[in-house]
């Protein structure tokens, strides 16, 4: 079994409370932007790079930073997922907000589309259940509802 360390970002627009998802070509599902952490790359760097590569957006990661200035932002969570071949993906998940006002667009071959969704719209599209659970958590913790 291979272990792949990944980083991803749940991006919420603070004004509209919508989440940005990418349509993953292989899975044919809407997922948060993210991907494998490269050698000599921190999880934060990988998360920011993957978001930019997949959507063209620059984001700011939100979360507690431990006391020392060069410590990392505490991730929203860490998730284990096994794929059909039995490989394990360990995903370090962050919460982020956009810092530029460009319209996101699919930039990588892995994704076919990029779109903002309201929480209600998530019930009408093909997403993994944890996407809804995580969005509900972010809306409650950061936006009071």
What are these regions (language model features)?
Residues 1-19, 92-95:
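Conserved N-terminal beta-strand and adjoining loop/helix that marks the start
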Residues 3-5, 30, 87-88, 115:
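Residues that recognize and position ribonucleotide moieties
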Residues 21-23:
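Short, acidic/hydrophobic/Gly-rich beta-strand patch recurrent on exposed beta strands
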Residues 27-29, 122:
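A short, flexible beta-alpha/helix-coil linker loop
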Residues 31-35:
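A short gly/proline-enriched turn/hairpin at secondary-structure junctions
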Residues 37-130:
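Unchanged
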Residues 123-145:
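Charged phosphate-binding loop/patch that engages nucleotide di/tri-phosphates or the phosphate backbone
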